[in-house]
Design a protein with these regions (language model features):
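Charge-dense, low-complexity intrinsically disordered segments
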Residues: 51, 104-105, 159
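Short, hydrophobic/π-rich interface segment
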Residues: 130-188
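Short, charged/polar, Gly/Pro-enriched secondary-structure boundary elements
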Residues: 148-151, 201-205
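Amphipathic interaction/junction segments at domain boundaries or subunit interfaces
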Residues: 56-58, 62, 66-155
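Short coil/loop linkers at secondary-structure junctions
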Residues: 22, 74-75, 158, 178
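C-terminal edge-of-domain segments
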Residues: 191-201
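Short low-polarity hydrophobic stretches
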Residues: 64, 141, 172, 195-196
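N-terminal, charged low-complexity regulatory/assembly segments
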Residues: 1-68
Length: 205
């Protein structure tokens, strides 16, 4: 776990630097202490059983949120601060998505990814789907239980799981030539996550 603590404390420190925080070394030390305690907990062992989930990363982000919430920051501020720490890491992924969006079969790639992710999530039990429908040019699903939500909720910050929920919206925002993503509801602040992934070609028929 020492490697993970070092990795994520560096990301947290970068987020604090980017946002002009003071007493950064003290804040990073507090974060490292909190994250170590979380990694050493029985709850971490219970949560760290899902192959499709990087629980070390999830806990690291929860620890960041708890540190910032303790300092009085609001949810929107916390989400922006935490995301700023991961900006450089996400840049390469965004570039890859924009390259995929140039390809004529971009929707097919998105479709295959969704189906594979669904199958893997069902297999390891990390996400419970009310339904997952695949039709011509569209995937629609509804998620009623999600271990991302459960972990954030355990630490009393369910609404901040939006950090993970919005990654779908961010990803599809780079596939605008071929894919339309519609989020009807968000599980971090509602009863379920209800999304549609649509082939834009089918909308034009």
């Amino acid at each position: 776990m020492e490697k993970n603590i070092k990795k994520y404390s560096k990301i947290y420190k970068n987020a604090l630097l980017v946002n002009d925080f003071s007493d950064i070394d003290e804040k990073v030390a507090s974060y490292e202490c909190r994250l170590q305690q979380m990694y050493d907990s029985q709850t971490y062992l219970e949560h760290n059983v899902y192959p499709t989930m990087d629980v070390a990363k999830i806990y690291a982000i929860i620890a960041m949120c708890l540190e910032l919430k303790q300092d009085g920051y609001l949810d929107k501020e916390i989400i922006d601060i935490v995301n700023s720490g991961f900006a450089k890491l996400r840049k390469a992924f965004m570039i890859l998505e924009k390259i995929i969006d140039i390809l004529p079969f971009a929707y097919t790639i998105a479709k295959k990814w969704n189906i594979t992710d669904y199958e893997n999530r069902v297999k390891d039990g990390s996400i419970t789907y009310d339904y997952f429908k695949v039709s011509e040019g569209k995937i629609e699903y509804c998620i009623s239980k999600c271990m991302y939500i459960e972990m954030f909720e355990y630490y009393g910050i369910r609404s901040l799981c939006k950090i993970f929920c919005i990654t779908d919206e961010t990803a599809y925002s780079n596939l605008t030539k071929h894919v339309e993503f519609i989020r009807h509801s968000d599980h971090s602040c509602g009863d379920c996550c209800h999304d549609e992934v649509i082939d834009i070609k089918c909308l034009k028929k």
